[in-house]
Amino acid sequence: VTAPPARNVPALLLRLREEGFSGTVRVSGLPGGSIHLRNGLVGAIETPGAPTVTSALLTSGRISDEVWLAACAAEPDADRLGGHLVAEDLIGAAELEVVCTAAVFDAAFAMALSPPGGWELSDREPALVAEPGVEPRQLTEETSRRMALLSRLWGPPGELTRVRPAPVAGAGPRGSDGWLARRHRDVLDSVNGRRTPRDIAFTLGRGLYAVMLDLIRMEDLHLIQWDARTTANGRPSTAPRVPQADTTTAVRAPEAAPLPKRRPGGASPAQDVGQKKKGG
């Protein structure tokens, strides 16, 4: 008996977990992305909506561009790249695991901000993966929690990704006297009235969700302000008016969406080098 098609991506991932599937789920849409599974666990997610592990490591300066390129040349299989980085003492195993796992959760959150169009399965593609990976149910639950928290603190999370915060004139020192945490200062220094939260996340190599929370905190401290225009619920936004879908579950897809056409895969870890300076 053939099982009925999954109604959305979370349901699909649960089924693939039961099957112990190793491969890639390509999700179409904006931003869309590729979900890399190993034995049914989510090892990595690559999406234009959130910084990758590569971006996080390089933009932060944790690993230099030159060292990264040399590591990619020495170990071209991205699945084994993490082990190579640890073996060469370029990063600790625990630290790498934290970075990889955090990137999985952040990418799932970023993909959930807009309704996906459909999905298709493909063979395993090399990726810098978290070991052993994240349980799909845990990923869905955490994404739902993040969406709910942002909705309560600010409003529709999808709207927040498109606003362009600006610093408040005469707001005082930017933490030079120690009253503002370093991570908040970094976010504040990246606010210029042109960058969206996503732009800031890529500029800093930090998770989109964390940046959005920090921006809300900055607004509460009257250090930033949103565009004068507002959304229907009173929140400011420069975003074009587009229908908002129910995004309380991770990476949702319509029940009867047609499968998208195949498109080339995402960038390899080495291809992310040089992208870290974009965003404003």
State where each predicted segment sits:
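Acidic, Ser/Thr/Pro-enriched low-complexity segments and adjacent helix/loop capping patches
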Residues: 1-280
